[in-house]
Amino acid sequence: MWCIVLFSLLAWVYAEPTMYGEILSPNYPQAYPSEVEKSWDIEVPEGYGIHLYFTHLDIELSENCAYDSVQIISGDTEEGRLCGQRSSNNPHSPIVEEFQVPYNKLQVIFKSDFSNEERFTGFAAYYVATDINECTDFVDVPCSHFCNNFIGGYFCSCPPEYFLHDDMKNCGVNCSGDVFTALIGEIASPNYPKPYPENSRCEYQIRLEKGFQVVVTLRREDFDVEAADSAGNCLDSLVFVAGDRQFGPYCGHGFPGPLNIETKSNALDIIFQTDLTGQKKGWKLRYHGDPMPCPKEDTPNSVWEPAKAKYVFRDVVQITCLDGFEVVEGRVGATSFYSTCQSNGKWSNSKLKCQPVDCGIPESIENGKVEDPESTLFGSVIRYTCEEPYYYMENGGGGEYHCAGNGSWVNEVLGPELPKCVPVCGVPREPFEEKQRIIGGSDADIKNFPWQVFFDNPWAGGALINEYWVLTAAHVVEGNREPTMYVGSTSVQTSRLAKSKMLTPEHVFIHPGWKLLEVPEGRTNFDNDIALVRLKDPVKMGPTVSPICLPGTSSDYNLMDGDLGLISGWGRTEKRDRAVRLKAARLPVAPLRKCKEVKVEKPTADAEAYVFTPNMICAGGEKGMDSCKGDSGGAFAVQDPNDKTKFYAAGLVSWGPQCGTYGLYTRVKNYVDWIMKTMQENSTPRED
């Protein structure tokens, strides 16, 4: 039994809508019971309406049918509520009440309260499916353009050039899909200047060659689109989309946006969307492709060539750094680079910048220093100084350098050439003073004669004239081209010499006018008795070691009789063949004949055989002070006539007829040209 009931229910649930039917109140035609509520759901096939009519109506009457009633509902709308008794007004029709609804569903609900004072028989009603005109029977028009009715339904259609949307009700214009690739063109809304279609979405695409941007131009009078609502929202709208940039939406009478739109893109989508209403003429625009502009970037510290007010796609500029600036990436030392305006509106090589030239850490110099710079960039200033008081800056310029635009440290006088610190010559740290009479001279300190060089073999002297050269007599080195030499020591004791500076000779240069003899001991001609020793390593100057000056070539350096000069050395004294401590004496210049008149001590030849020339200076003769054997090669130091703080080597101890009288000295002034030439030609180490 339950299976039969379930089957019946399922059959009712899934029953097809019927074209007609009957509805009777409970127990009809007998009196309906109290406290009853029953409903009937009526459904006819889609496309039909329902005609519901009553042939009998006998329900307890009450105000607003509050007690008993039959209610007719269509959707959420109550079509009617009935009670009381009704009779037909048409003798030819049994219908006492009827309802016509354009929908295919209807609900009928019957209610009775708890008591009835009289006997009421209820109602008898019938329904039939009726054809409806969807095109006219509804408040809302089902079709946007043409509505076509048929029995059981309707269909929509569109005028030419329109199409029916997927909802089968609304018509639209097929206005999408157009792609514009020409560099210039015109686009308008459908039917322009006639009213554009409603309920449409038109999409236009502009696709230009990369490197060109789309520029849209409109006139205000060419734009008439349905205005915005009260909230400011466009009902119909025109929108421009270029990449991630959007212009619009625009609507209203007269174009409200900029009349010239630069999109910065070669691709532009134009979207025109309309709603269901509106009768406006639409819009018309023009577009053209403008070469993509590149910004005129203000690259600091540079000049752009060529200079233009505007740069566009494919333009090439040369960016040249200002003086003192360079490109920090790319080629080393580059001062300019090229940049091209690219299709994306950006410059190539945009990462390259002009930054201050860096001159780097300045080079160090011998015998001097440079202060640590706060900066090494263009415009920075450094200063070189020499190790005073033993060195001075020979080539001028003041030692101040600035970081120049070419990346070099430059001096106003020397340019990029580094300053040269050379030894200060002829200035003893402690001037010589004759403190105590010694036979033939006085004790001296090496600080009185810092140029004094001691030759160990043979026992002799020399004069330091710069950091690489020693001046001495030719006869000192003619027999030993690799002499052992020392500087910086007052005493020549072995223990003291070990603490002094030993000089290593590289090459000996004897004046070409010096005559070499097989037996030097019998020499009677000491003309051109001068030689130079090139040292292997430079001598570091200090309080006990510094050179003596060379004489100038002007007449100021011509010695006069009576001019005083200083001699120093470790030569023979009255008591000893060799001195251990440095001795010195002050001697006057004497006429050359004074030396000629002195009888030669232990002559090896006739007195007339000894040669006296203008290349020799005669000095001494007073109080027994004179140079002697062992002093050879030492300087005869005379105060500089143009700078009283300095001494120059006026002569070199050469020979003498007799110790303690007059001595002969090589006149150095006559050999300055040879000295300078020899040193210049041999300024670099010799390759023997």
Swiss-Prot record:
Extent of the signal sequence: 1-15
Glycosylated residue positions: 174, 406
Enzyme Commission number, as recorded: 3.4.21.42
Protein origin, superkingdom: Eukaryota
InterPro entries: CUB_dom, EGF-like_Ca-bd_dom, EGF-type_Asp/Asn_hydroxyl_site, EGF_Ca-bd_CS, Pept_S1A_C1r/C1S/mannan-bd, Peptidase_S1_PA, Peptidase_S1_PA_chymotrypsin, Peptidase_S1A
GO-annotated molecular function: calcium ion binding; identical protein binding; serine-type endopeptidase activity
UniProt entry keywords in alphabetical sequence: Calcium, Complement pathway, Disease variant, Disulfide bond, EGF-like domain, Ehlers-Danlos syndrome, Glycoprotein, Hydrolase, Hydroxylation, Immunity, Innate immunity, Metal-binding, Protease, Repeat, Secreted, Serine protease, Signal, Sushi
Domain EGF-like: 131-172
Record note on quaternary structure: Core component of the complement C1 complex, a calcium-dependent complex composed of 1 molecule of the C1Q subcomplex, 2 molecules of C1R and 2 molecules of C1S. The C1Q subcomplex is composed 18 subunits: 3 chains of C1QA, C1QB, and C1QC trimerize to form 6 collagen-like triple helices connected to six globular ligand-recognition modules.
Family: Belongs to the peptidase S1 family.
Protein name: Complement C1s subcomponent
Originating organism: Homo sapiens (Human)
Organism classification: Eukaryota, Metazoa, Chordata, Craniata, Vertebrata
